[in-house]
Amino acid sequence: MNMISYALLGVILGISGVIYAVYLAVWVLRQDPGNEKMRFISQAIATGARAYLFRQYRTLAVLLVILAVLILVAIDMPRRTFGLTALAFIVGALGSMLAGYLGMYVTTRSASRVAQAAATGGMGKALLVSWRAGAVMGLSLASIALLLISGFYLVFRSVLPDDWAVPLVALGFGASLVTLFMRVGGGIYTKAADLGADLVGKVEAGIPEDDPRNPGVIADNVGDNVGDVAGMAADVYESYIVTVTAAIFLAAILGLPTQFIEAIILFAALALVATFAGVNLLKTTGVKHPLSSISLAIYATIGLSVVLFFIGAFTLGLDSTKALALAATTSLGAVIAPLIVKITDYYTSYNYGPVRKIAEQAKISPATVIITGYGVGLMSAIPVIAVIVAVLGISYMIGYYTVPVSGFGELSKYLAGIFGTAMASVGLLVVAGIIITADSYGPVSDNAGGVVEMAGLPDEVREITDVLDSVGNTTKATTKGYAIASAALAALVLFIALIFEIVYSASKILGKGIVDMISESLSGLQLINANVLIGAFLGVALVYFFSSRTLEAVGRTAMEIVEEIRRQFREKPGILEWKEQPDYARVVDIATRRALGEFLIPGLAAIVLPLITGLLLGWNALAGLIMGAIVAGVPRALLMANAGGAWDNAKKYIEIQGLKKTEMHKAAVIGDTVGDPMKDTVGPSLNPLIKVLNTLSVVFTYVIVSTNIALGIWPSGLLPF
């Protein structure tokens, strides 16, 4: 097969995946939605989620149009790329929106169907419905990403034979930008609604979780979908697009044989084939422990992907050493996915020591719960970082000795190693379909439990949905670790791509050889260069600013929701006596309005700061900013996500021991409340932040380098070195 054939294969499989996702969606929606009350609850959740998403998309549309025009004028017109960079940016953004909407459309309508399946078909049927609802999201994500990458690659190679790589990366920039706002806005919504509903409902009014008398209960369930489904899907979709396009970009700019570009697209296509199989490998008959069935489906998918990588590598026409090296580095990335999931599980599941240690501290006070949980979160970052470092080192060495980079003098071997790390990153991301299937299953089962509670179904039905929900909490927590690790590797690959695009742009503008430009550029990137250090501190500061703004936004929004729920209880005392209907829509509207208002400032900071830094301080200050954001952002995201997950499950561990409404339980609830915005707002929002910084910089590199040269600050930056 030639290069065009592999890209066509990607297009065909991408379309096939979308069709299969639609088939699964139709199957799920044909299931019995239950009685009238169950349908009402499910419809209320779906309506609230759709209203939020559409209002968010309308808000984003203005920013996307402004940036598309800027890219057209500043990038496409000077480089004569026929507007394709702007087009890729818009399509990448629309793809992210579509992936989020498709998955959320099905998951919000699945809750009553899972609840009814639990009532009539037991554990097995309920598990199947919730799993297939999650698979709609997983398959949509992977298929749309593969379709866009393969399709745009075909178009760009045909229209722009010599300058097609940067427009392809713009696909990732569009996806990154939408994801950033979806993660921030969705995270603020979901945790503010959760906090508001719990603080007034459970703590003040003393009513159970998901009680229909709570005016915030629908907003809480809507938040599960806009944050945990649409947000997570957009996050991993973006990482997929960014990593694969950056790897293709590197292969092109390093002048590698076309088989290496073919390998990237081929491996992504083969992983999607494995995902088709994995989605159908879930055992549901006679199952008592759903987590084991889900884990088996994930392991089988990744194992099949690895086998297909090695088989596919030998169809590329490379010698056996290079084929094996490509398959090995990609497989290395794929096999660490379950390892990262397992590490996260160890630190966030109540089956292991760290969470039980937090639960034990609840016997003393909320303060010791928070202190111990924070310590667990700090420690949890270490093994994940160790795995990332090991993968980078091993894949670098494989690439160093096998990838045929030439024409860069003494740097050729070093650059070959860099491509090896890019392939490992590709391996981690192309198995995203099955990981997101497991993640999206979580909110579906969570909402199903809420429907059972609100509809007043029998206790035995609630027991089934509680088991499914417990497994869903585990899959949601562990997927956060995967998303953060994948974001880290994607950001590192993009960072290398950025440096080479800077060199390439300077070479074109100044008319110098690329080898000379590499040597000249690296002199401006030394760690003792003041510009680099200034940029690094700015990157760290951006991470902390971003974390602060999102945390405070949750608090402000939750405060308004709390006041509204209190007002309804005060003005309508019949609500608590089952005599009056709560105004669910009012709370949904508050959460929507405040979340959309709060996400603009941190989002705009992620766009404006790198552009100003690169244009005025110099390209090396921009490089320092990005590296500072990566080094500060990845451990902080792991801390936030895992500490929050550990606090959550410490509370659940106390509950399963029958210790609800004790002082010990109250202490654990406080820890869980503190951890909620950390694990579902701040931590997840840092993933797209570090990728937006990279993709934005790659797309605007030509403008940044041109400005640096015009201002006389190339290559050393504003401060002389």
Curated annotation (Swiss-Prot):
Annotated positions binding Mg(2+) 2: 221, 224, 446
Residue numbers marked as site, Important for potassium independence: 476
Compartment(s) of residence: Cell membrane
Broad class of enzyme this protein falls into: translocase
Cofactor or coenzyme needed: Mg(2+)
A Pfam cross-reference name: H_PPase
Keywords linked to the UniProt accession: Calcium, Cell membrane, Hydrogen ion transport, Ion transport, Magnesium, Membrane, Metal-binding, Translocase, Transmembrane, Transmembrane helix, Transport
Membrane topology: Multi-pass membrane protein
Coiled coil: none
UniProt xrefs under HAMAP family: PPase_energized_pump (MF_01129)
Family per record: Belongs to the H(+)-translocating pyrophosphatase (TC 3.A.10) family. K(+)-insensitive subfamily.
Protein name: K(+)-insensitive pyrophosphate-energized proton pump
Organism: Pyrobaculum aerophilum (strain ATCC 51768 / DSM 7523 / JCM 9630 / CIP 104966 / NBRC 100827 / IM2)
Taxonomic lineage: Archaea, Thermoproteota, Thermoprotei, Thermoproteales, Thermoproteaceae
